[in-house]
Amino acid sequence: MKTPKVGFVSLGCPKALVDSERILTQLKTEGYQVASDYDGADLVVVNTCGFIESAVQESLDAIGEAMSENGRVIVTGCLGKDEDKIRQMHPNVLKVTGAAAYQDVMEAVHEYVPAPPKHNPFIDLVPEQGIRLTPKHYAYLKISEGCNHRCTFCIIPSMRGDLVSRPVGSVLEEAAALKRAGVKEILVISQDTSAYGVDTKYKLDFWNGQPVKTKFFDMCEALGQLGIWVRLHYVYPYPHVDAVIDLMAQGKILPYLDIPFQHASPRVLKLMKRPAHSENTLEKIKLWREKCPDLVIRSTFVVGFPGETEEDFQILLDWLVEAQLDRVGCFTYSPVEGATANDLPDHVPEEIKQERYERFMQVQQQISAAKLQKRIGQTMTVLVDSLEDEYPVAVARSYADAPEIDGNVFVEDIDKSTIQPGDMLEVEITDADEYDLFAKLIKIKSV
């Protein structure tokens, strides 16, 4: 009997990527092979995104391609919450499940492609760290599912439910397994990382025989003992985040915070129903930088939210200039089906949204470029992601750069035979542009 093969298409954010990794790991554990193309697959699983309209369309297109090329398709992920929409366009998909519905996906696979008999996972070994879709030297670590907030532009709680935190012992054991597998950088992700453990009332758990609370600070402190890069994403600026800045100042975890501020106008933040909107974020940023001068802050913002006036937008620009954030992403407001913000009055015309986006990016590009210019002459440690095919250049990142969303450090004039992805290098920064740094190699620190 031939080994059954399952194709897999993964769309969406890093949290969805982790869901895909978990399903793929279970498939491999049960003896399925993962097909490299549509033709060789007995069926195809498409893990979708449903957050904004462009992502919905991309997901529907991916389902259509899988149906056209293979014809036997199971749909999962955030868009799976809207089965009617999927079946209107693709009525013949085999099954539709929601986000993080691992067991439902596996049951659907079993129904249409039974698992191979006599499979022994202890002989057909799956790596301890599971199947990963990222390069070997970094990995995403998802610590919770869902969110307790009800931001008016977001439908994540309706797709993924309220906050459910993983036991801290499970989180730390996965992190340790990743380190043993050679991972040099862990990126901590969730919908609301700094709320970790709230739902469990910070329940006590155990790791390596030691008691650890299921709590944001305690988890970060334990991760900091692993001796690898630990990067925090999706952190809301709650008061208890201040203590984690101390860990950064001590070199326990990377001095990098990804905080989705989204706006600065109190009126717009209230319309958005953002948590911590009443916090004086500028004072908080100043305090953090006093504690940890190397701190890098990345954030995302929405311009053109319903009801945003020119005065609101100017408040945002003024805040941006004063905050001097290192890395920033910006989006024009896009209606999301099911979001309560759709019902707000005074929607902003598209041409004004675009004009505000361009003004916003112009201000931030000047800030980012000036900050990168100050790096010239500094010595930094970087992690190599890849090597250029045609040039003697390593594409790397410093502590200030998360993969895919931030900039790179291009290490020039190297001997490519001595360097590979996953190596840590010590470099001197020689030049900069608006987003990236350029450097020369001082020495290879670790391989």
UniProtKB/Swiss-Prot annotation:
Q: Which cofactor does it need?
A: [4Fe-4S] cluster
Q: Which GO terms describe its molecular function?
A: 4 iron, 4 sulfur cluster binding; aspartic acid methylthiotransferase activity; metal ion binding; protein methylthiotransferase activity
Which stretches are annotated as coiled coil? none
Radical SAM core domain spans which residues? Answer: 133-370
Q: What is its EC number?
A: 2.8.4.4
Record key words, sorted = 4Fe-4S, Cytoplasm, Iron, Iron-sulfur, Metal-binding, S-adenosyl-L-methionine, Transferase
Location of the TRAM domain: 373-443
Q: Which residues bind [4Fe-4S] cluster 1?
A: 13, 49, 78
CDD domains (UniProt xref) = Radical_SAM
Query: Which reaction(s) does the protein catalyse, per the Swiss-Prot or TrEMBL entry?
Result: L-aspartate(89)-[ribosomal protein uS12]-hydrogen + (sulfur carrier)-SH + AH2 + 2 S-adenosyl-L-methionine = 3-methylsulfanyl-L-aspartate(89)-[ribosomal protein uS12]-hydrogen + (sulfur carrier)-H + 5'-deoxyadenosine + L-methionine + A + S-adenosyl-L-homocysteine + 2 H(+)
**Cofactor: record remark:** Binds 2 [4Fe-4S] clusters. One cluster is coordinated with 3 cysteines and an exchangeable S-adenosyl-L-methionine.
Principal place of residence: cytoplasm
Subcellular localization(s) per the UniProt record? Cytoplasm
InterPro entries named among the record's database cross-references: Elp3/MiaA/NifB-like_rSAM, Methylthiotransferase, Methylthiotransferase_CS, Methylthiotransferase_N, Methylthiotransferase_N_sf, NA-bd_OB-fold, Ribosomal_uS12_MeSTrfase_RimO, rSAM
**What does the record list as GO biological process?**
tRNA modification
Recorded family membership: Belongs to the methylthiotransferase family. RimO subfamily.
Q: What is this protein called?
A: Ribosomal protein uS12 methylthiotransferase RimO
Taxonomic path: Bacteria, Pseudomonadati, Pseudomonadota, Gammaproteobacteria, Moraxellales
Gene that produces this protein: rimO
